């Protein structure tokens, strides 16, 4: 199993998804139309621009945090603005890497399964999600992103993956490939090896 897919699965695993649930979700895959792919890319670009604004424009970050947080003052006092800036800088970089991966190989968004990738970015993009978080939950999310995400390099594809996506023709081929990777993947062993 390639390193990049392992990294992706480890992030998905952090969201409490079970291997069986992931395999089951593959049954629901269908080909993406050009319009659907464009919509996803637009979503990623919107996220990227938002994340960039958050760490380059102090006023914009302050306004968003005031608007997105239940208790703005307590969050800033407990966590601090610098941690948010660091995470938003990191997320800008990751969304750019994702856009580069898609540009290099459009089939990277071949399946609806790949939409789960966007979930990685949602906690720091979605007001409803951020608003529901306690200070402790927000701090732990910042810690997760700040320590794990830089190690994973999610969207740097190996030659094997580039070749696979370039030659991908059918959804069945994709399902078989990912199902095989999931069945072979040992999360506990991987996490232990990486010290994650």
Curated annotation (Swiss-Prot):
Domain of life: Bacteria
Coiled coil (residue ranges): none
InterPro entries recorded: CagS, CagS_sf
Effect after changing residue 33 to N: In strain: NCTC 11638
Pfam families per UniProt: CagS
Name of the protein in its database record: CAG pathogenicity island protein 13
Organism this protein belongs to: Helicobacter pylori (strain ATCC 700392 / 26695) (Campylobacter pylori)
